[in-house]
């Protein structure tokens, strides 16, 4: 474990740079980098709500083609919202990541803050950070590099050591940095068209209970017998 951490630090040092000290009063343009899964996008909403309450001028969210729908119905009252979409990070090429970061700075200027929402210590994450070169960066995975603000230390401990719920970690991080306190909850904004479609489809069921169960890995999957027992109890 120590050797892997040492090798990662050596490799990441190539992409490091000296960030500015964080100044919340001069934070107008913020980038959230989260080209990941739908659940990760839903978990990042405490960050969005804290930025909205602080009334930043411009929020740019880098989404994946998979989680774009989470943000499509998002409306911000006093903050300009820009959505930029790329291939999910796991499948994106290094060139795509590099070009995207360059295009953001060329079109919108240097971000005052980049919030790294991927929660992954990997080469692709660091490539994006190094190419974007925001004035400072936030993260919660415990990366100790000059380009990341030390304000994230406690939030990183919550995520990496305490395994706190992800929305709680994001809300705590923003509060530690001086942003307004917000509820640590998942969100999934839906348009009226989608809500109408769901109501129409569900009307024939009458009263019902819906379960959103995790089935992406075997250890999180209910067996048929457990599922039947659960249904019987309900």
UniProtKB/Swiss-Prot annotation:
This is Putative uncharacterized protein YeeL. It comes from Escherichia coli (strain K12). The gene is yeeL.
């Amino acid at each position: 474990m120590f050797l892997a951490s040492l090798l990662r630090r050596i490799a990441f040092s190539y992409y490091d740079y000296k960030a500015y000290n964080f100044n919340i009063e001069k934070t107008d343009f913020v980038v959230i980098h989260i080209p990941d899964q739908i659940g990760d996008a839903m978990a990042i909403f405490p960050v969005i709500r804290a930025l909205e309450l602080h009334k930043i001028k411009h929020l740019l969210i880098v989404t994946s083609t998979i989680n774009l729908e989470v943000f499509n119905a998002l409306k911000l009252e006093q903050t300009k919202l820009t959505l930029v979409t790329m291939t999910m990070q796991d499948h994106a090429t290094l060139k795509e990541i590099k070009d995207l970061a360059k295009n953001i700075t060329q079109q919108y200027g240097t971000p005052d803050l980049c919030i790294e929402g991927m929660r992954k210590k990997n080469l692709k994450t660091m490539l994006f950070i190094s190419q974007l070169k925001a004035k400072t960066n936030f993260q919660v995975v415990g990366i100790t590099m000059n380009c990341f603000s030390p304000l994230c230390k406690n939030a990183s401990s919550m995520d990496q050591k305490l395994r706190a719920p992800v929305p709680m970690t994001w809300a705590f991080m923003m509060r530690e940095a001086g942003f307004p306190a917000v509820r640590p909850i998942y969100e999934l904004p839906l348009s009226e068209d989608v809500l109408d479609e769901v109501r129409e489809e569900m009307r024939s069921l009458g009263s019902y209970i819906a379960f959103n169960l995790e089935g992406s890995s075997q250890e999180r999957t209910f067996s048929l017998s457990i599922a039947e027992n659960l249904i019987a109890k309900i």
